Regions:
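Tryptophan-anchored aromatic micro-motifs
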Residues: 1-14, 49
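Edge beta-strand at a domain terminus
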Residues: 98-132
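Flexible, membrane-facing loop/turn or short amphipathic-helix motifs
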Residues: 10-13, 69-72, 103-112
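Alpha-helical assembly-interface signal, strongest on the long, hydrophobic N-terminal helix that forms
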Residues: 12-21, 27
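Well-ordered beta-strand positions in beta-sheet-rich domains
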Residues: 21-23, 48-50, 78-82, 119-125
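Contiguous, well-ordered beta-strand patches that form the walls/edges
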Residues: 37-98
């Protein structure tokens, strides 16, 4: 995932900044699971989402991650993506928009999305892992 800033971003990252890399599994039941290669496992490197097919080769993803910094929960991050699979079915690419929220200190409200810490948009690409 590579950042691509716009004037409306909150705390934008410079264009071309590597946001994340890792592995993802999209399941037939419409769920998705990702392991981040850029985040320290101690700070939370696993997240999940749901996807929906919108045409023959296009899918949308609604993905949630829990953001941690040095062992402290900082809040939820919502990643929305639009994915296009190539004709071989072995590669995909797309665009994403991520909003990272500040966690509220009130117990039971850890997923509140009231205070935006950062908003990031960008592009990504992936290659299917096979047994060959």
């Amino acid at each position: 995932m590579i950042a691509q800033s716009t004037p409306t971003h909150t705390n934008p990252m410079p264009d071309g900044t590597l946001i994340d890399f890792g592995t993802a599994a999209w399941h037939a039941d419409g769920t998705e699971f990702q392991t981040s290669g850029i985040r320290n496992p101690a700070d939370g490197d696993v997240c999940q989402g749901v996807w929906q097919q919108v045409d023959d080769a296009t899918f949308v993803l609604n993905h949630y991650a829990l953001a941690w910094t040095n062992g402290t929960y900082t809040g939820p991050a919502n990643i929305r993506a639009r994915v296009t699979v190539d004709s071989t079915g072995n590669h995909y690419s797309g665009v994403f928009a991520t909003v990272v929220y500040l966690a509220t200190p009130v117990a039971g409200h850890e997923f509140d999305q009231n205070t935006v810490l950062a908003s990031i948009t960008g592009t990504f690409k992936a290659t299917r892992v096979t047994m060959q």
